């Protein structure tokens, strides 16, 4: 049974960086994975790509041939793939049936593709039907949107709409969480925003933003959106810093539960011990995100830097290369995680 992540999110939310981090992380735990680029405009991929939509269609060609702008060209490209999907699915089939690969789909950043337009949804539904892939949507959103109450409310609406549109297991993630403290102090604790607690507490802050005549009209709209999100009560968030190994480990544990990977890992192979630990709940960190990313961020960052320095020294003592690559760092982070959980992964 094949499994996959569909990585979506607004432009600049760190989707390609996350996919690259996933590739390194899965290599470290022994999970055979492949990344699929679904963005016809992305010609500078930071990761090795197994299947690239640009081999079928590119944004530059569409814009030139159809006289379309970037957004229109992207919509046209995805529609074209939707209408002639057979060869693309054949390549995906080879990855999941012959290579037994866990897939990560790196999607375009235009939000209308996963909130209002049906082509991207149709593509994944066809793959789900023909290949029986168990998907989980990972919706990355820059944590900067937490700094403004009205922007936070708008992001909640975007996340809700994406969940309803894609109709798949869905994990919303505030990315670049290591940058949040530099944006200024938040009026509430971090878990207020990740758990989407009582939104009525935001009302006085929304009123402050809407002091002008036009702002007051937007305040009424924001209030209506707030009520809608509260009525559905579906949205919540995880947090992620790709450079922080523990937050990445924690997120992958959550995703593996969402798409059912922990119950079918033996059919994929390569990381059954990780899957067993996930089933037992050992990989889900029970740490205070307010403490880690706001109150004592500098302390935790210093500890991480000390660990990295110690690893470099260890490599030097073993007469290995001084430059520790990402997979070495993942191996080290996983060993530390195992020690905390009192287990020993066999890789």
From Swiss-Prot:
Site (Stabilizes the phosphate intermediate): 71
The EC number(s) this enzyme carries: 3.6.5.-
Keywords for the protein's UniProt record, in alphabetical order: Cytoplasm, GTP-binding, Hydrolase, Nucleotide-binding
Enzyme class, first EC level, given as a word: hydrolase
Gene3D superfamilies hit by this protein: P-loop containing nucleotide triphosphate hydrolases
Binding site for GTP: 12-17, 175-178
GO biological process annotation, one example: establishment of mitotic sister chromatid cohesion
Localization per record: Cytoplasm
Single GO term (MF): GTPase activity
Record carries keyword Hydrolase: yes
Keyword Hydrolase in annotation: yes
Pfam families (alphabetical): ATP_bind_1 (PF03029)
A single GO cellular-component term on record: cytoplasm
Motif (Gly-Pro-Asn (GPN)-loop): 69-71
Outcome of substituting residue 112 to K/A: Impairs heterodimer formation with NPA3/GPN1
Other notes: Present with 9230 molecules/cell in log phase SD medium.
Homology family: Belongs to the GPN-loop GTPase family.
Function text: Small GTPase required for proper localization of RNA polymerase II and III (RNAPII and RNAPIII). May act at an RNAP assembly step prior to nuclear import. Required for establishment of sister chromatid cohesion.
Subunit annotation: Heterodimers with NPA3/GPN1 or GPN3. Binds to RNA polymerase II (RNAPII).
Protein name: GPN-loop GTPase 2
Organism: Saccharomyces cerevisiae (strain ATCC 204508 / S288c) (Baker's yeast)
């Amino acid at each position: 049974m094949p499994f996959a992540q569909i990585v979506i999110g607004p432009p600049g939310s760190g989707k390609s960086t996350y996919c690259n981090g996933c590739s390194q992380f899965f290599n470290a735990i022994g999970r055979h994975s492949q990344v699929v680029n679904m963005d016809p405009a992305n010609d500078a991929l930071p990761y090795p790509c197994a299947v690239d939509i640009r081999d079928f269609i590119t944004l530059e060609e569409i814009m030139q041939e159809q006289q379309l702008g970037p957004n229109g060209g992207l919509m046209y490209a995805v529609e074209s793939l939707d209408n002639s999907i057979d060869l693309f699915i054949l390549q995906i089939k080879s990855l999941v049936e012959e290579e037994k690969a866990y897939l990560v789909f790196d999607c375009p950043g235009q939000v209308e593709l996963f909130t209002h337009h049906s082509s991207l949804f149709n593509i994944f539904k066809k793959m789900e039907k023909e290949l029986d892939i168990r998907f989980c949507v990972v919706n990355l959103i820059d944590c900067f949107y937490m700094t403004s109450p009205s922007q936070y409310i708008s992001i909640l609406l975007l996340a809700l709409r994406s969940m309803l549109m894609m109709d798949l297991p869905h994990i919303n993630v505030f990315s670049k969480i290591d940058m949040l403290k530099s944006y200024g102090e938040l009026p509430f604790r971090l878990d207020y925003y990740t758990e989407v607690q009582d939104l009525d507490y935001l009302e006085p802050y929304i009123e402050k933003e809407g002091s002008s005549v036009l702002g007051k009209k937007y305040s009424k709209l924001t209030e209506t959106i707030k009520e809608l999100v509260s009525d559905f009560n579906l949205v919540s968030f995880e947090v992620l810093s790709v450079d922080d190994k523990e937050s990445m480990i924690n997120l992958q544990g959550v995703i593996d539960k969402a798409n059912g990977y922990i119950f079918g890992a033996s059919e994929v192979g390569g990381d059954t011990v990780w899957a067993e630990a996930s089933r037992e709940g050992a990989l889900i960190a029970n740490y205070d995100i307010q403490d880690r990313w706001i109150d004592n961020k500098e302390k935790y960052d210093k500890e991480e830097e000390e660990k990295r320095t110690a690893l470099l020294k260890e490599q030097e003592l073993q007469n290995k290369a001084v430059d520790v690559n990402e997979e070495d760092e993942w191996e080290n982070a996983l060993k530390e995680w195992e020690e905390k959980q009192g287990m020993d992964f066999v890789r």
